[in-house]
């Protein structure tokens, strides 16, 4: 995947690489289930922690490649929340932005948390709490994995969820 377009002054890309149809799909309200090949598929609800360059890129990839991801994963994936301290007026995902991790942790629909904040804190605390709540976590945060990977893998195992990292 290659991103096109340019970032704004905060390093945010928005939906620079999407075509108009992908934008319409991303903004459409979904009932949480869809029919494909005669089978009902449950919508997997995800949250992204951080909406900088990496987090906005994750949101963009999930939005622009929605159908391909659903086909490969077996279920469609929808970003329900984006955790960030900032607001993003005019962004296609502005209504998904929340400022309190508790919103994500307390929502039983959220099954996947994508940690894109980087660094040790609050990434460690938020990842740990998500795993304790039974939510799978994925990250590319090498510092977090190096410092706490064994503990987070153990927590995932104990809570019957997954901890994915690259």
Please provide the spans of the model-predicted regions.
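Rossmann-fold NAD(P)-binding glycine/threonine-rich loop
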Residues: 123-133, 140-166
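Acidic, proline/serine/threonine- and glycine-rich low-complexity intrinsically disordered segments
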Residues: 4-37
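Predominant activation on well-ordered alpha-helical scaffold segments within soluble catalytic domains
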Residues: 9-20, 55, 59-63, 153
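General beta-strand structural signal in soluble alpha/beta enzymes
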Residues: 97-98, 114-115, 138-140, 163-166
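N-terminal glycine-/serine-/threonine-rich beta1-alpha1-beta2 phosphate-ribose binding loop
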Residues: 32, 37-132
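Catalytic cores of large soluble enzymes that bind and process phosphate-bearing ligands
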Residues: 4, 11, 46, 50, ...
């Amino acid at each position: 995947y290659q991103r096109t377009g340019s970032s704004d002054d905060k390093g945010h890309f928005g939906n620079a690489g999407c075509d108009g149809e992908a934008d319409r799909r991303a903004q459409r309200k979904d009932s949480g289930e869809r029919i494909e090949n005669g089978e009902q598929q449950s919508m997997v609800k995800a949250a992204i922690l951080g909406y900088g360059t990496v987090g906005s890129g994750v949101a963009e990839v999930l939005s622009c490649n929605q159908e391909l991801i659903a086909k490969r994963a077996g279920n469609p994936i929808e970003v329900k929340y984006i955790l960030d301290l900032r607001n993003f007026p005019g962004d296609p995902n502005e209504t998904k932005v929340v400022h309190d991790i508790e919103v994500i942790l307390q929502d039983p629909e959220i099954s996947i948390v994508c940690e894109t904040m980087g660094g040790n804190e609050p990434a460690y605390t938020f990842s740990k709490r998500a795993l304790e709540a039974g939510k799978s976590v994925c990250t590319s945060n090498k510092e977090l994995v190096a410092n706490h990977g064994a503990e987070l893998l153990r927590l995932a195992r104990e809570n019957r969820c997954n901890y994915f990292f690259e």
